[in-house]
C-alpha cells in the first residue's frame, strides 16, 4: 500500500512522524496524498482551532475515499469522538508509533491509545526533505498552566535515555546532518527524573564529530540556571534562545498558573542579551483577566524585554482547561490590535539587532525559493542568497549583506 503521513503542529510531531516513516516496512511512503491508499494523520490539539484543522482535513480525506488513521495529541482528546462518528478507521496513541506497519495492516476498526506516560526511546536515522535533524530528548510536561491541555495528552515529564540520544545523534551526523534541533514537550525539564541535566547532555552532544550547531526548542525562564549559562559562549550553541514568557504582567502570570515572574524575566533576558543572544518568546494576548489596566502593565514591561523574535497569538478557549471556565474580558478586535502592537515592537527590535550585530554569519542553506536560496544564521534570522551555484544543504559564511526589515540579503 501507499502511505501518506500528514503532520500537524510542533517539532515533536515532525519527529514522531519520522519515527513512523523509519519504522514502516513492506509499504511505500507516498509524498502525494491524492495517490495514497492510507493517510496517517499525526494531529495537534493545542487549541480548539487545531482540532478543527485536523477534523476538516480528515473530512476531506474521507470524501476522497482514503483509509484514515489518527495519532498524535488529538488521538487522546478527540480520537473517540472521530472514531464513533466513523471518520477514522483506527486511532492509536503516540506510544504505539513504532508498530505502524502492524497498525495500518489491521482489518478491524480499533482504538488503542496505549500509555501516555510510557518512556519512549525511538531512534531516527534520517530526515528526508530536511537540512537539519530534529531530536526528541523528552516527552511530557509537569507545569499544568491553566490554558494548556498538553500535559493531559502527552503525560508527565520523562527523559529519553542519554545513551540512546547520543547514539541517535551520532547516526544522524554519520548520515550528513550537521545541525540538530533538540525538541520535546518541555525540553528544559530534561534529566530531572534521571539525575542529569540539559546542560550535561549538550556538552556531550557537542563532542560528536560532524555536529556544527545545536538549536534548542522552547525553554522556561526557570530552566536557565547557572550550569546552562556556562555554555553561552560555546560556538556550537545557536546564538538564539526561545524562552516562553506567555505574558509580562505579574497578575496575568498568576491567573495563567505560570511559574515565572515578570521582573525576574526582564533581568534574565537582559543578561542573555548582553551575551549577544537573539531572544524569542511566546505570548498569549487576550487571556481571561487581561483588563485594560493589566494590558498597559504588560505592555510597559514588554517594552523592557530585548526580544528579537515573537510567537504571539490571540487566546482562544481550549476545552477541558481551567482557563476555558473563565470569562473573556477582551473582544476580538482589541485582542488583534494588542497582538499587532507586540509584533511591531519585536519586528523593529529585530531590525535594530541585526544592524547592531553586523558580523560574519554562518548559514546552513535550506532551500531555493524563487530567485533566492534561503537559510538561517546563528541568530535564527532568515537570509536570502542569490547565487549561480546550487547552495542547498551547504554551510556558507556570509561576510557582506544588506539588512532589510524582512531579512538579510546577499550575493554569493
What is each of the regions a protein language model found here?
Residues 1-189, 226-227, 241, 262-270, ...:
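Proteins enriched for Cys/Gly/acidic motifs involved in redox and nucleic-acid/cofactor modification
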Residues 40, 73, 100, 182, ...:
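Residue-level signal for inorganic ion chemistry
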Residues 68-72, 77-78, 82, 174-292:
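Conserved SAM/AdoMet-binding glycine-rich loop
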Residues 290, 306-307:
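Contiguous mid-protein beta-loop-alpha structural module that forms a pocket-lining wall or clamp
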Residues 325-412:
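Terminal RNA-binding accessory module
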